[in-house]
C-alpha cells in the first residue's frame, strides 16, 4: 500500500472516523488518537517496538476498538528538512505497517516533538521517572495534533 499525502488521505476517510498517530522510536512506539471530529489529539499509550506483525496486530486492534480509519506516522526529518537515516527508517516502517494493516497511512513531520513534550512536562514539574513513561504517547499526540491542525486549516477557494 502506498503512503498518502495528508490532504489526499483526508479526502478518502469516512465521516466520524478517528485517526491514530504513531511516533515510532527505536524501542517504543507512542500512540495517540483523534476525536471523531478530527480536531483534538490525545495520548493513547505506548507499545514496545518488536516484530512488525505484532505491532500491526496491536494497531489494528486499536483501530477496530476506537473506530479509526487511518494512521498518521511521525517522520523525523533532519533539521534542514532533508530525509536522513532516521526518516528513511520511519518511511520504510510506515510502508510495512500500511501493507500489514491495510490501513491508509500518511506521514507528518515530527521534528522536535519529543523535545517540546519533554520541555512541557518539565515545566509542569513532572518527575523524570514519570516523564519517561509519558513522553512517547505525548509526542505522538503532539505530532497528530499538528496533522489535525493542518487538516482543519481553511483552504483558499480555487
Curated annotation (Swiss-Prot):
Query: Mind listing the GO biological process terms from this record?
Result: rRNA 5'-end processing
Q: Which family does it belong to?
A: Belongs to the YqgF nuclease family.
Q: Which organism is it from?
A: Acidiphilium cryptum (strain JF-5)
Q: Tell me the protein's name.
A: Putative pre-16S rRNA nuclease
Q: What's the main place this protein lives?
A: cytoplasm
| Signal peptide (residue range) | none
Q: Name one Pfam family in it.
A: RuvX
GO CC, any one term: cytosol
